[in-house]
Amino acid sequence: MHAFMKLLKNSPAGPVFNPWHDRDPGHDASPGAPAVRREQLASYMAERQKATVILLAEALGYQGGHFSGIAMTSERLLLGHLRHKGLGPEMVFAGQARRTSLEDLRPGGFTEPTATIVWGAMHELGIDTRQVILWNAFPWHPYKPDKGYLSNRTPGDEEVLLGEPVLRALMAYVSGARVLAVGQKSAALLAAMGITAPALRHPANGGAGMFRAQFAQIMKKGRKVLR
């Protein structure tokens, strides 16, 4: 896991935020926020050394990994404020989760629709969440320069290719894990790497229903990830 974590430090230049090594001065609760995000990602990964599935989406978003440090995972989930949906922080990792955003921004923590849909789908299917690693083709947070850190930007094709070394390190960490592509950007990266993977509809922008159906169909074939 050391090689994987080390590669995350090498984020590209431009309108890209690195949550594990950069501080968001206007929105982070403390100077130690990047270290907290690194610790939370490390805890998440350490509990998934035997994962059998990598669910690969597009890029980190400001409502998810920007503050949690974990792909497709929101602070609101980590803080236990999604229990009414059957989702709790113990699904993510066993330790005590911490917020890194200023409480005044979102008292309950930022929440990301895609994150809630993905974790909800795993919950509904009875999936052992330690068997699934959530990750992104472009592992950092691309934002719109005119709108700042609290915005999302679709990474360009060349940017997405920069995520290949990180993804290869992740695949080496959980060798044998099956990769599922969520959206066109992740499918394109996998194709460039010569990897054939099932392609799922991204749950954003009206795609939640199709994503749930496709995800359920694929995961039910791999029964060992189900409880």
Q: Where are the model-predicted features located?
A:
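Short, flexible loop segments at boundaries between secondary-structure elements
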Residues: 194-227
